[in-house]
Amino acid sequence: MILTVTMNPSIDISYPLDELKIDTVNRVVDVTKTAGGKGLNVTRVLSEFGDSVLATGLVGGKLGEFLVEHIDNQVKKDFFSIQGETRNCIAILHGDNQTEVLEKGPEVLEQEGQDFLEHFKKLLESVEVVAISGSLPAGLPVDYYASLVELANQAGKPVVLDCSGAALQAVLESPHKPTVIKPNNEELSQLLGREVSEDLDELKEVLQEPLFAGIEWIIVSLGANGTFAKHGDTFYKVDIPRIQVVNPVGSGDSTVAGISSGLLHKESDAELLIKANVLGMLNAQEKMTGHVNMANYQVLYDQLIVKEV
């Protein structure tokens, strides 16, 4: 079973409009509300793929109750309740444009943060792999993910970590390392304080920087150009076919689902990388975020090429 962790989930509300009129009333006929957050996208994709998944994270108030109720019934859930209210994130879809209004979310009390660590520790007993995704809510220390990684390491459970900015920096500077990280070029540039290109020789050098020491897998998305990956001392380039992109949002989360599934099933390097890329591409072909059509899985799978470089 895979444990997904979403520390700052949201109710994602979609308002489709023909036109967004400013400073007047806009009436919406077809409103969509879903359980949102990067970790919950991972959860949905794992469930659709057919893997057993347990979802956890922080929820609060009536919106927190709504969120838990709107997660697929096939998914096991064990969220931790806090005093603050789960946030709303609103997307206004007008014409070809998308305007987002994102609430900051609740402020987590120090004791709640400590109590979740105990909750997380107990959940580790019943899972084989952990996937941690997204931002940290206000109130938690910047190195909170390092604490989760430490507990998972102590329990002998591999961790796939998908976060960015100060939270990722804190983990990289910690003695407790996740099994997998998946930064993109922009995030690599931010971490190293210099521009990082997609040149394979440069990426090889970058991923051997001391900052990344001790991390077993580093998987770098190159968008339409595929993926560059480092596993131990071996480097890989994944070539992907061109596809019709409908909605790329959530493709990174779908990739995390594939990585986690590959670890769960102890797949070869090539199998893990292909599965991760295929699930990311399948998500990009769908309108709904964090959703894959498994009917197209094998067709794409057979087109991917993994080369050791």
Curated annotation (Swiss-Prot):
Q: Which Pfam family, just one, is annotated for this protein?
A: PfkB
Fetch the SUPFAM superfamilies from UniProt.
Ribokinase-like
Return one GO MF term: ATP binding
Which GO cellular component terms, listed alphabetically, does the Swiss-Prot or TrEMBL entry include? cytosol
Q: Which UniProt keywords apply?
A: ATP-binding, Kinase, Lactose metabolism, Nucleotide-binding, Transferase
What this protein catalyses is: D-tagatofuranose 6-phosphate + ATP = D-tagatofuranose 1,6-bisphosphate + ADP + H(+)
Could you say which EC number(s) this protein's record lists? 2.7.1.144
Q: Which family does it belong to?
A: Belongs to the carbohydrate kinase PfkB family. LacC subfamily.
Question: Cross-referenced NCBIfam families, in alphabetical order?
Answer: 1-PFK (TIGR03168), lacC (TIGR01231), PRK13508.1 (NF010033)
User: What protein am I looking at?
Assistant: Tagatose-6-phosphate kinase
Species of origin reads Streptococcus pneumoniae (strain JJA)
